């Protein structure tokens, strides 16, 4: 049996005393609860559930409790959703500065969120740089749009929760314990301190673990070394906790998964692998196919995308004989056109049938071609578009005839939840055309992260922050060169640098990044029995050095 990923001795007293434990993410909270269950299972038949919550979960609970209290200050108000938020920022920018691209909506939103989380106000910024002048205009319009629609931001809800604790509408906690936080915004600190007079940080028990440093030729060699090391470890003992940390895991997920899979097969190791980073829902096979089918109805698409749809198992064309598909592909290529419309595609594939008419299997395709209206002229609500999209997908045979595997079934369920979220945008009170509807649907599917449900696994692939607080028998942390660890500063271009440094805002002070890096490093050391740090000596034509924080650790060579 695998050991738990959490040292439960750190939490036993707090859980027995029914204290509130807060973590920065759901994963850490779930692992603490799981470890408590394993601990209790050996001696008890039943036990009480520990009060362990991720910070987001706890704040959501507090907000819902506040709404149940019918508090006058928030009566009739709701927290703006992520897609609503994007829409209001885009609208604020277009109304004030139509020549400015809507791509600035995200950075404007992130900047305003940081200002609020740091318990500051835009009015406090005195400098009048061109970027700041624009930003202040956008914020003014954004706040007006929220007020008009009785919406507030998440940090606004924090302020309301603080007031509830300060006015005794909420009872204070005797003690709040936090675990796994690397930094806490000032407004969140204020909220926790209002919720309890005693806020304590739980630290891992100090260990004498001495990390070793491995130098690799390049990033690919570094990943392969880590993967082979993990495979060898699991072959010698499959019942141990092994972790590989890849700082940019979310951006290199498929590559890392492929290299790890190759290493396990090379060493003849059959082992489950748990990956902390998810995939944008839009990039999963089933949902990408659905989006492609919806888009093809009213948008000319490149030949390559039509071929992807034609050979996909996720629509009615999967039942068309292969030779007919080959003939259709040749027919499309003979037109020498780069793009084809839905009608043009239907014409070619139906004409390839030996009788000269569409076979029964393609009748829905013909009906859709002949009967569907011009989407570009339709104006509907979001929920009406959701119904239309679902109808079109059903007509086009999505998600296919064959039985879905577990992964595909999870993707299908996530897609249905996404359409429900899309329908809830009706509260914007607008009707939109096909192009706008598809844009919002794509945004939602890109923002939604798909995490496959998998069984517990001995090998964990994690990002830097996801690994923090978890316990491992052996841990390998990659990407530890001097340019990457500590992280470099990144000044927000919309705010004056001096203002950011004065208030110690995110990513503006090298000493703050150094402090976070040291805290992470100490956590890895205290939560691992065996620890390796690696870095690439070259990246392209660039020569890299190990992080200065590793200078006192011995160097070793690891055999592949």
Region spans (language model):
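Polyanion-engaging groove/track-forming segments
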Residues: 1-560
């Amino acid at each position: 049996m695998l050991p738990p990923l959490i040292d439960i001795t750190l939490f036993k007293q707090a859980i027995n005393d029914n204290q509130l434990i807060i973590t920065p993410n759901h994963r850490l909270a779930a692992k603490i609860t799981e470890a408590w269950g394993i601990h209790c299972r050996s001696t008890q038949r039943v036990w009480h559930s520990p009060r362990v919550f991720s910070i987001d979960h706890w704040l959501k609970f507090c907000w819902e409790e506040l709404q149940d209290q019918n508090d006058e200050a928030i009566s009739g108000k709701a927290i703006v959703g992520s897609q609503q938020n994007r829409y209001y920022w885009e609208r604020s920018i277009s109304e004030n500065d139509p020549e400015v691209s809507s791509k600035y909506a995200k950075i404007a939103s992130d900047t305003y969120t940081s200002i609020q989380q740091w318990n500051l106000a835009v009015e406090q910024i005195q400098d009048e740089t061109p970027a700041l002048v624009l930003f202040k205009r956008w914020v003014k319009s954004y706040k007006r749009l929220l007020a008009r629609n009785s919406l507030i931001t998440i940090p606004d809800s924090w302020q309301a929760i603080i007031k509830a604790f300060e006015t005794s509408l909420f009872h204070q906690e005797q003690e709040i314990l936090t675990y796994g936080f690397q930094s806490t915004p000032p407004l969140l600190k204020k909220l926790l301190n209002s919720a309890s007079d005693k806020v304590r940080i739980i630290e891992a028990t100090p260990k004498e673990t001495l990390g070793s440093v491995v130098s690799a030729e390049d990033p690919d060699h570094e990943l392969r070394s880590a993967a082979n090391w993990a495979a060898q470890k699991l072959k010698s003992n499959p019942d141990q906790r092994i972790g590989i940390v890849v700082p940019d895991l979310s951006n290199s997920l498929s590559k890392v998964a492929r290299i790890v899979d190759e290493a396990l097969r090379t060493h003849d190791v059959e082992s489950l692998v748990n990956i902390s980073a998810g995939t944008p829902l839009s990039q999963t096979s089933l949902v990408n196919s659905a989006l492609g089918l919806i888009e093809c109805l009213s948008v000319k698409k490149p030949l390559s995308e039509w071929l992807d749809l034609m050979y996909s198992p996720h629509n009615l064309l999967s039942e068309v004989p292969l030779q007919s598909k080959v003939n259709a592909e040749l027919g499309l290529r003979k037109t020498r056109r780069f793009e084809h419309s839905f009608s043009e595609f239907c014409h070619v594939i139906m004409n390839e049938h030996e009788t000269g008419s569409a076979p029964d299997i393609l009748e829905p395709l013909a009906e859709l071609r002949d009967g569907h209206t011009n989407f570009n002229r339709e104006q509907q609500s979001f929920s009406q578009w959701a119904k239309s999209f679902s109808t079109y997908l059903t007509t086009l045979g999505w998600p296919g005839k064959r039985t879905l595997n577990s992964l595909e079934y999870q993707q299908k369920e996530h897609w249905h939840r996404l359409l429900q979220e899309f329908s809830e945008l009706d509260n914007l009170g607008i009707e939109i055309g096909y192009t706008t509807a598809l844009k919002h649907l794509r945004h939602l599917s890109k923002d939604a992260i798909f995490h496959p449900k998998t069984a517990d696994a001995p090998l964990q692939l994690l990002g830097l922050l996801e690994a923090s607080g978890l316990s491992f028998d052996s841990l390998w942390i990659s990407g530890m060169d001097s340019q990457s660890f500590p992280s470099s500063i990144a000044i927000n271009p919309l705010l004056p640098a001096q203002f950011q440094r004065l208030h110690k805002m995110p990513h503006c002070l090298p000493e703050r990044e150094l402090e976070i890096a040291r805290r992470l490093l100490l956590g890895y050391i205290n939560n691992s029995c065996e620890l390796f740090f690696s870095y690439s000596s070259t990246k392209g034509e660039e020569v890299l050095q190990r992080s200065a924080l590793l200078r006192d650790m011995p160097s070793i060579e690891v055999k592949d």
